[in-house]
Amino acid sequence: MSDQLAIRKASQEDAGAITALINLAFAKVEQFFVDGDRISEAEVIASMQTGVFLVAERDGELEGCVYVEPQGQRAYFGLLSVNPHIQQRGAGSLLMDAAEEHGRKLGCAFMDIKIVNLRSELPDFYRKRGYVETGTSSFPPEVETKLPCHFIDMSKRLF
């Protein structure tokens, strides 16, 4: 057994494991304002057409993932997910570093993220990583929520 996490680009064969991991990671933290799964396998596969999932593995087991999508001079990252059983051990930070490095390699000057305003712990977490608030945006109207919510938009200069 290795203590090392390896980061790699996901392939379509990883879609099922990525879907399960994202839904597991988001289940408890989002259940107070939205029901159901966070993402479907079809949505993961569709996302792979416009961006990339970076995955963190240890001994062949998927322990985390993050989605990165280039958008001109900017890149977007989201769906940062870590297996709840290993959270607070650095996997999320390692994935964020990998996402930002991927953005730099693509020539993107900024990395953007959208966080749900109801997740009050997130703004400070991302501020500590160098992200600043740039505004707000609407939550997707097709997603039924238990509470009114919106996104807080944040951005970080990559170089």
Each language-model region and where it sits:
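Extreme N-terminal starter segment of soluble prokaryotic enzymes
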Residues: 4-6
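C-terminal "cap" of GNAT-fold acetyltransferases
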Residues: 45, 53-54, 109-112, 116-123, ...
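Residues at secondary-structure transition points
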Residues: 34-35, 39, 90, 94, ...
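Conserved glycine-rich acetyl-CoA-binding loop
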Residues: 61, 83-97, 104-106, 117-123, ...
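Short, well-ordered coil/turn elements that cap or connect secondary structure elements
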Residues: 2, 48-49, 105, 128
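Acetyl-CoA-dependent GNAT
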Residues: 9-15, 19-85, 96-98, 102, ...
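Short, solvent-exposed loop/turn segments that connect beta-strands within catalytic domains
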Residues: 2, 61, 145-146
